[in-house]
Amino acid sequence: MDITNAIINYRRFLKRKNCSKHTLRNYMSTLKQFVLCVDVPIEQVTHKMVLSFMDHLLDKRLKPKTINCYLNSIRGFYEYLIEEEQFPTSHPVKRGYSLRFSRPLPRYLRDEDVPRLFNVISSKRDRAMFMLMLRCGLRVEEVSKLTMAALDLPRSQLFVYEGKGVKDRVVYLSNDAYKILVQYLKARPSSRAKRVFLIEKGRFKGKPIQVRGIQHRMQHYAQIAGLKVSCHQLRHTMATQLLNADADLVTIQDLLGHTRIKTTQRYCQVSNLKVQRDYHKAIERVMHRHGL
């Protein structure tokens, strides 16, 4: 089979599975690099060639997590060839090839740091963007793509369409998030743009603000506040605060849009306040039972 046609067919297959544009772009980029590196017909690719490609990526000092993403792309391509195309070839990617790597625990803002950050944010737009991350758990990409049609203010909720993993969900606006969002919408310039958050200055004024622009704003405010904080940490903060307030783990999973509960469970490891509270409740019952 011609490699170009094989990759084109695979791309169509992924599109039929409703993979996001981001996923398609990453998969195609990986396969292009892999094909150029091995430089043999796809049916002649061996286990050793895959290992050699991994060595090439390690030499480029890519992180183990990134290399594993490359392997998953190649593995998926060959699974497609074998299962869907009935292509007579052996699978060159063994399961044991994935690299081990440490997963840092989610970082979150302490309670006293939240007002410290928001007190330096004067822009109504920026306060609204970051409040949606903190109170609704939106990812920075989801804030950037949020449309006016996704807002349901009468019900104090908004719809997140095609979040990570092409997963739709509903999130709810807290009182402060609702108030700050409405303040921005009243000040938002009249525009035909579908996106909620727009660039306010410069040659691109009135155009939708992009992910990098939002991240730059966060870096700006973090520096003023003297904090080390990223957009994603606001999302982590929301999850940790809900867990400390005894919210159900499945509820938090739904609000964050996690596909697997294991992803959400990682927040249990950083929720020290809840651990302390549960411990003292339990130990008091033990002491009472023993008459101490």
Sequence positions of predicted segments:
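Conserved catalytic core of the tyrosine transesterase superfamily
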Residues: 1-292
